[in-house]
Amino acid sequence: NDMLDHTALWTQRIIEAVEEIGEAENTNFIITSDHGQIDVSRWAMPNVELRRRGFIRTDANDVITDYDAFIKGVGCCALVYLKDESDKKTYKAVYDALKEMRDSGLYGFTEVFTREEIAAKEHLSGPFSFVLETDGYTSFGSEWTGSIIHQRDITDYRGGAASHGYLPDKGAQPTLIACGPSFKKGVTVDRRPIVDLAPTIAKAMGVDLADANGKPIDEILL
């Protein structure tokens, strides 16, 4: 397709530029990506349900006046923020509500991860309390009014035909292509987590990332 053709063109131009200055034999070329995309067919607004359950409160004009929990849609996952995470009663109430929504199959997500669970699983961290994972064809918005489910609308970039932000088990898997003086030829390795990428590149450059979450992919390094 056009995108692959353009990528190949610009990659070739970079390689040719390095060859022109006589540094090809001293240069490592690394081609990779952080994620792919999956097709989505609908857009979910779980804040509408939080509002119905009383976790989001508004005035007569639908302006938020107070909240216990708010969901920020970020593509094919959503981050749940609590106003006061130290309020254990509210924490449990929100957690129970999210799991009930998950189990219903109506709101577009099939997993509810706590912050601790998603940090251990995917190295994702932040000031959120929970992460909601897509069912594989739903992306998420942050609205708290109107319908919970919207059909795909490509006129709004937030609700386009495809999105990312999901667990890496879904969708096309990005590849890593590496060649140059630091890499072995003809070596193929199985899937590795993306946190291994930076330590691998660093080691190829002779740098030790001692505090990195991942580790070098030594199988491809000389």
Residue spans of the language-model regions?
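Residue-level signal for beta-strand positions within conserved beta-sheet cores that form or flank
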Residues: 25, 172, 213
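Active-site-proximal segments of metal-dependent phosphoesterases and phosphodiesterases across multiple
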Residues: 1-11
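Terminal low-complexity/disordered tails
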Residues: 201, 206-210, 221-222
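Cytosolic regulatory/linker segments at or just downstream of nucleotide-handling modules
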Residues: 215-221
